Amino acid sequence: MKKKVIRIILTSVLLLIAWLIDRNYNLPMWQTLIVYFVPYLLISYDVLGEAVEGIMEGNPFDEDLLMSIATIGAFIIGFLPNGEPEFLEGVFVMLFFQIGELFEHYAEDKTRDSISNLMDIRPDSANVIKKGEIIVTNPANVAIGETILVKPGEKIPLDGEIIEGNSSLNTVALTGESIPKDVTLGDNVVSGCVNISGLLKIKVSKTFNNSTASIILQLVEEASENKSKNESFIRRFAHIYTPIVVIAAIILAFIPPFFADSYNDALSTWLYRALTFLIVSCPCALVISIPLSFFCGIGGAGHIGILIKGGNYMEALARAKTIVFDKTGTLTRGVFEVEAIHPNQFSEQELLHLAAHVEQFSTHPIAIALRNAYKDTGCECKVENIKEFAGQGISAEINGKNVCVGNKKFMEHIGAEIVACSKCQHSKGTSVHVAIDGKYVGHIVIADQIKTDASSAIANLKKIGIEKTVMLTGDRKEVADVIANKLGIDEYYSELMPADKVEHVERLLHQKPIKSTLAFVGDGINDAPVLARADIGIAMGALGSDAAIEAANVVLMDDKPSKIAKSIAISRRTISIARQNAVFAIGIKVAVLILSTVGIATMGMAVFADVGVMVLAVLNATRALRVK
């Protein structure tokens, strides 16, 4: 770039000298040509070389050829009958073209630097502990199972498990979330997070290339390969358009003079118009700015933890009118908690005490919820003869009494009559019943908790024009009904098996509005068939999950459903910017093309319509990078 700046400055000085010589000395035409040809050759040798190279490779029709023909033609016009020398304009056009190229490359480089800074999540070194010593090395050299030390202020270089220490992590580079995440012994951590406070020893679980930060960066880099329809069309259009423009310019130069009184007298006039036509016809503003718009949009989204795998998926997301949610892990936290305790003859703590002790060895999510809720007071109970009844519950002997914990079917099986509870009529949870020696003593309500921003997420989707929201769940109808009504979801389908969810998505695909798309939102782990079948698959909570990143077209790195509306808004804004560039570039070019055909537009106006429009379009494209 520095070389080009020096060439532009030197050419400007030589052009000024050439103009002063031309103005003050009445030189013969060929001497004037030499005076102007020196700065022309200095500023255009690379463009001329690219044009020749394109011809040799069988791909001649690009902006280099158009500029070469136009500027060389400007030098030739002066030697035609009644032709006015256009040496100054020939050099000026190429000079301005190179200035435009300089601005374009500068804007593109700044954009790429901005995206690189936004996605600066991969550290360059790792502190490996070997034989009691700390060795600083490249993260790519660290093997699975080795121990690394991460000091406060450092980025975690590799995924792994904390084996010593506790701290708070800044995950903003991965998720866009500014609130620190507390971690301690036994927690899994991912690369790219910044260690804020404590000293951490981490046992590496993934190689550098397979760690989260590397996968995310690879995903962003590969996104440019998945072209949108607009990008693909523009590239095909340029290949067809440029040869047509060259043919049209040839016709414009040589056919109209036949209708003049003197062909030779009119040729120079129409040749000038044709050369102006060639300059303004260059499609570089479209070819450069539209892909750059998508590139910036994808980079900006990545900064706040929304990974869109390409311009084609961005276009599909922008046209979404139907959003289908899996319930667990998407609208709800996917973590069961004790919501209520309804004893018949014991205290709440005593009932919970019995249930937690019976379930103490179970790995079922409900058992874990009971144990988490129970505050052990140090009471020692003798728990014996634990028996599990598949799909029903568990029984055990506690201090000589038979305690059964399970569902309604289990109570019927042991002959315990359930006492109706008016408090549970509108509960969204699952009732865990408890009986002692065959007598019903109460129940505990376990519920999956709705995410704090789920309600606002649905409301925001409706605000941006989503016409239908649907929830699919394997849970009971009563639970699904409560959640759907609370969140304002339009339709819900409950008690579904995985295959049923695919069938429902198939049906909804046939019902969606014409030219719109259907997006399915899931956790990306158990929903792979549905994610694949939807027009656009969105995986939530994918931080540290390779399966989620692989399965979806759009990946939300945290658990916030509110980012679904944000991802759609970013996609729509990006496409709007790309369309603005297309309309602006085509509009200006068409206007100047018409003016050049009728002889009003000069080469200077043509250069602005080409290079000036390109620079403005590139600057406009960079707006897609700024995501609020």
Q: What are the roles of these predicted feature ranges?
A:
Residues 12-13, 232-261, 273-294, 579-608:
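Bilayer-spanning, highly hydrophobic alpha-helical transmembrane segments
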Residues 18-32:
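Short, hydrophobic transmembrane alpha-helix segments
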Residues 400, 430, 436-580, 588:
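Conserved ATP-binding TGD loop and adjacent catalytic N/P-domain core of P-type ATPases
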Residues 63-68, 174, 272, 282-358, ...:
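Conserved catalytic phosphorylation-site environment of P-type ATPases
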Residues 1-10, 241:
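N-terminal membrane topogenic signal
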Residues 19-22, 36-125, 129, 141-148, ...:
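Actuator/coupling domain of P-type ATPases
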Residues 151, 338, 342-468, 477, ...:
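P-type ATPase nucleotide-binding
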Residues 52-61, 103-117, 292-311, 622-628:
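Juxtamembrane helix-loop transition segments at the membrane interface in multi-pass membrane proteins
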